[in-house]
């Protein structure tokens, strides 16, 4: 049985409409986990048939970091001035995705940025490679 068959068979017994997956995406001020910040984080939960159930999204204030790559994601400094910080939404975000199988496109990037924000928030440098057990959609596409 292939990777996709295992994945689908693992979750299809669930009731349609019950969220079991969460697809996560972040937008950042850049690519360096030590200096750059997440300025948008979003998740869509889906049922076992990959039908969207609900979504969660917020812009984030990057604590004084200037957004220099607005041309990529369209998020400007003005848009995040009054947005909450990562630490202010962390509980809501983790509650929303709790118990979900997580997906992300280029998951290692999103994961390292979430880890970096969490480390800044807690004051602990975990330096772990994983935040949650993400399935990377880039790797998933290679299985097809």
Where in this protein do the model-derived segments appear?
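Conserved non-catalytic scaffold segment of RNase H-like nuclease domains
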Residues: 2-132
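Histidine/lysine/aspartate-rich catalytic loop segments that bind and position anionic ligands
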Residues: 128-144
């Amino acid at each position: 049985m292939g990777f996709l068959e295992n994945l689908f068979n693992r979750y299809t017994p669930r009731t349609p409409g019950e969220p079991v997956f969460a697809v996560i995406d972040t937008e950042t001020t850049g690519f360096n986990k030590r200096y750059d910040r997440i300025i948008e984080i979003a998740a869509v939960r889906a049922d076992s048939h990959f039908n969207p159930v609900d979504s969660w999204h917020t812009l984030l204030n990057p604590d004084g970091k200037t957004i220099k790559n607005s041309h990529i994601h369209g998020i400007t400094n003005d848009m995040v001035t009054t947005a909450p910080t990562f630490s202010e939404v962390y509980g809501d975000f983790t509650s929303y995705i709790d118990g979900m199988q997580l997906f992300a496109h280029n998951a290692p990037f999103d994961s390292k940025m979430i880890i970096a924000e969490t480390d800044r928030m807690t004051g602990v440098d975990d330096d772990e490679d994983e935040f949650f057990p993400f399935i990377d959609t880039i790797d998933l596409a290679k299985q097809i």
